[in-house]
């Protein structure tokens, strides 16, 4: 049988206190657990429901009773804590807040019926909102200053490795967080009473109380702590110790932030820590005896790695590391260059540079995580010390060595790695144009002499250069490779002609190449007087070729020809690989027995210097005369045997006592040491060729720029700067750009502006 509805507030209060509220208050005040009956809660809830159903006046009386009960207890709590010492304040505050929450939880459950209709209809605060407001006004607002100070003390202890107070910190900051809830709701979860944001209300990110704590208290405390720590550590630790200490502290700080700091403040806390622990002391770390330059010079990679891990947290400080990194690379590179024994030999010089490049690449990858800033500084450092012509020339020489015999016996993977290393250094060259010119020349020589180990490797290298610098850069190289393929088809067709590719029974092989692509020494194009059986071979091929390619002209590079010549007068009838001038010289010696070098040149119709070069191979080629003994050459004569010098008036003759162990040997001329005058002449010629190419590139670039700016104002200074930016094959100097601007004006491609003589216009 149900109880009658209570209609009087005084009676209702008395019954509510009897059923549950008196017991709750006794518990939160004295810790005496209430001995209510199992039905006490339902009885109390039913009383509230019955009274509220009577109408608004009764509901309002119940609402006021709810608020007054909670407020009264909170005010009593304030009296208990108001004069509490700082040592006991936090513990007392936490305990009282737990009691308040306990009371609010059960009171809100008893009176929850009011939230269904009354508080909504009257636009009043919910029971939980009203209780939280009372907590703020009558307790927290009055003691928040002291609470903020005390919680900061606890955090300072935590930062000083005393983690015992961490749980208290979490509780206090959770209380502050709860106070800021825009729609607070108290619940019981896993036997623990806690506040949450009401899921039925939009969550406004309000942090009023948290902001007061952070902005007015904690931020300045963090500032002071970080500053003091940085100052103490920098004066009492070595650079590596300092780095490790800060990394450890920041790791611990992140744990603290994750455990009890609102994520909203994380960036501000980090900014303070990074500024003092990293930014303020970065330069000092570099200056220390054990600092960043020392780490580089002594290859302390693990220390550099940790330094980067710290400094990357404050990116503007990375410059301190890169400012030490760039000079370090430059110093290492210049040490290699200054070692004359190494730098003169491309087979030693370039591998040393490759090893340095690999080492720096690995350093950037392993210690600096391939950070773009370090990649950029590394590349600039290499470009900075590789700004001399020797680097372009020696890299080209090394590539030539690899293609001729350096790759012999190497695996495909080893060859690929070496090619990539060469390209890696190529990227750093200031004068890529010089490398291009030298490489074209050397590739031409390899392919003509058929001394390249692999055309596939040649093609692979061309492909890598093309990928790096574009198709224009490798035009000549590609054309040379195309010529080889076309020539193979041409020779196959010639072998099917009437002479079968062997006129008069002489096996005859020809390379047809385009003059525009190949680097051919003009001396090799000199006409040479030949016996009829040889001219018949040339005439036979010309007849075949010009029948297919009418209108074209063949220029014979006889100076590049090689022959297999058998020495019938020798006991073993040995065979020698000779040049055409060498063979023709031997024919003259067979005819005249003894003849001057000048006379041979006259008969052959070529320069004396050409004959001397070839005679040198007939006497001193190490394939048959390793000790360079003049009496053991294919020919002998009156030349200077000590200096190994030949003159126009020196007489030569066949050495009939010549012997050689090999059945087939080589008499091809070796590079003869040039005089200083010849060296200077060659250098001047190369410089002129290089400048001519540079001027062509500059004029093409300037024309392209001006053509794209028709109708726009182009100043002299802007044009020079823009041209300098766009040219990457060499470092264009302002004076050189200016000279080519004048050349374009002379060619009527551009003109000075009528309105302003310091500006230029394109002549359409």
Residue ranges and their predicted role:
Residues 1-764:
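Eukaryotic scaffold/interaction segments
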């Amino acid at each position: 049988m149900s109880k009658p509805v209570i209609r009087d507030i005084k009676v209702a209060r008395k019954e509510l206190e009897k059923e549950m509220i008196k017991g709750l208050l006794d518990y939160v005040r004295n810790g005496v657990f209430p001995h209510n009956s199992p039905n006490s809660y339902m009885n109390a809830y039913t009383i509230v429901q019955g009274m509220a159903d009577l109408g608004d006046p009764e509901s309002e009386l119940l609402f006021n009773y709810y608020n007054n009960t909670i407020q009264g207890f909170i005010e009593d709590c304030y009296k208990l804590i108001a004069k509490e010492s700082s040592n006991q304040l936090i513990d007392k505050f936490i305990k009282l807040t737990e009691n308040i929450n306990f009371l609010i939880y059960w009171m809100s459950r008893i009176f929850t019926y009011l939230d269904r209709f009354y508080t909504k209809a009257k636009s009043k605060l919910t029971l939980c909102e009203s209780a939280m407001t009372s907590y703020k006004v009558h307790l927290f607002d009055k003691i928040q200053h002291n609470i903020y100070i005390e919680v900061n003390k606890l955090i300072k202890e935590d930062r000083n490795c005393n983690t015992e107070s961490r749980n208290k910190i979490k509780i206090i900051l959770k209380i502050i967080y709860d106070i800021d809830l825009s729609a607070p709701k108290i619940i019981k979860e896993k036997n623990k009473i806690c506040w949450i944001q009401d899921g039925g209300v939009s969550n406004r990110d309000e942090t009023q109380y948290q902001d007061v704590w952070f902005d007015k208290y904690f931020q300045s405390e963090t500032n002071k702590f970080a500053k003091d720590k940085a100052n103490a550590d920098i004066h009492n630790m070595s650079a590596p110790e300092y780095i490790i200490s800060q990394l450890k502290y920041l790791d611990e700080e992140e744990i603290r932030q994750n455990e009890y700091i609102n994520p909203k403040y994380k960036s501000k806390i980090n900014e303070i820590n990074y500024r003092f622990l990293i930014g303020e002391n970065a330069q000092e770390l570099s200056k220390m005896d054990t600092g960043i330059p020392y780490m580089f010079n002594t290859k302390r990679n693990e220390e550099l790695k940790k330094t980067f891990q710290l400094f990357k947290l404050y990116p503007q400080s990375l410059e301190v590391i890169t400012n030490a990194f760039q000079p370090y690379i430059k110093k290492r590179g210049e040490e290699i260059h200054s070692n004359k024994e190494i730098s003169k030999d491309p087979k030693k010089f370039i591998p040393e540079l490759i090893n340095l490049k690999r080492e720096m690449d690995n350093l950037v990858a392993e210690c600096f995580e391939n950070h773009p800033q370090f990649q950029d500084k590394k590349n600039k450092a290499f470009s900075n010390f590789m700004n001399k012509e020797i680097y372009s020339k020696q890299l080209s020489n090394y590539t030539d060595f690899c293609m001729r015999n350096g790759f012999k016996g190497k695996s495909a993977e080893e060859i690929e790695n070496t090619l990539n290393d060469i390209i890696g250094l190529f990227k750093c060259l200031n004068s890529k144009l010089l490398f291009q010119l030298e490489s074209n020349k050397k590739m031409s020589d390899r392919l003509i002499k058929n001394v390249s180990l692999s055309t596939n490797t040649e093609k692979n290298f061309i492909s890598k250069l093309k990928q790096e610098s574009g198709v224009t850069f490798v035009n000549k190289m590609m054309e040379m490779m195309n010529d080889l393929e076309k020539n193979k088809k041409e020779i196959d067709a010639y072998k099917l002609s009437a002479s079968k590719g062997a006129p008069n029974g002489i096996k005859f092989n020809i390379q047809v190449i385009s003059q525009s692509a190949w680097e051919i020494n003009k001396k090799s194009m000199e006409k040479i007087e030949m016996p009829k059986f040889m001219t018949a071979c040339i005439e036979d091929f010309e007849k075949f070729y010009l029948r297919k390619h009418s209108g074209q002209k063949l220029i014979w590079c006889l100076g590049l020809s090689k022959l297999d010549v058998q020495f019938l007068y020798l006991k073993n009838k040995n065979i020698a690989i000779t040049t055409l001038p060498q063979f023709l010289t031997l024919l003259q010696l067979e005819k005249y027995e003894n003849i001057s070098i000048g006379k041979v040149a006259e008969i052959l119709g070529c320069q004396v210097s050409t004959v001397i070069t070839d005679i040198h191979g007939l006497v001193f080629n190490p394939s048959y005369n390793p000790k360079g003994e003049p009496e053991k050459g294919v020919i002998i004569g009156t030349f200077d045997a000590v200096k190994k010098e030949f003159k126009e008036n020196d007489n030569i003759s066949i050495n009939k006592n010549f012997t050689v162990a090999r059945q087939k040997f080589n008499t091809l001329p070796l590079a003869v040491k040039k005089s200083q005058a010849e060296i200077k002449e060659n250098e001047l010629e190369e410089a002129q060729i290089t400048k001519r190419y540079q001027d062509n590139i500059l004029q093409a670039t300037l024309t392209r720029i001006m053509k794209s700016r028709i109708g726009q104002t182009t100043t002299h200074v802007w044009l020079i700067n823009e041209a300098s930016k766009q040219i990457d094959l060499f470092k264009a100097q302002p004076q050189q750009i200016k000279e080519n601007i004048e050349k374009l004006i002379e060619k009527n491609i551009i003109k000075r502006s009528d309105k302003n003589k310091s500006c230029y216009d394109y002549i359409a």
